[in-house]
Amino acid sequence: MNAQWGTFRRKGSVHDLLVEAEDAMRGQGYQVANPVSNNNSMVMGGNDSVLAQATATSTGPEETYLIVSAFSQDASTAEQARNTVRDGIKDLYNL
């Protein structure tokens, strides 16, 4: 099993940023097993080749700390999934 992960901060609420992560997963055709509507801190989805997860917590007014992880038998597949989900999460507010 190969794992890829990264941490970063974005401007926006936990909920709104996780919705962006979920949208990025759905955009890749992933089945979302734990949608944002079922929880308030994590979204998870994947397919037969990869599992991706985005976890978030608030670090201040309109700022969120995120961890995006992906797991696959193939390191390249895990890396691509992590990057795709991460890149789908944009700053929602200008500083």
Q: What would you call each of these model-derived segments?
A:
Residues 33-50:
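A cross-family detector of function-defining hotspots
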Residues 4, 10, 43-44, 58:
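Intrinsically disordered, low-complexity segments enriched in small/polar residues
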Residues 26-38, 91, 95:
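Short secondary-structure junctions
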Residues 17-26, 52-65:
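Short, Lys/Arg-enriched charge-dense amphipathic segments
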Residues 57-95:
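C-terminal basic regulatory modules in eukaryotic proteins
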Residues 5, 48-54:
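Short, surface-exposed coil-to-beta transition loops
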Residues 1-32:
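Terminal, regulation- and interaction-focused segments at domain boundaries
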Residues 21-24, 41, 45, 69-72, ...:
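Small-side-chain structural scaffolding
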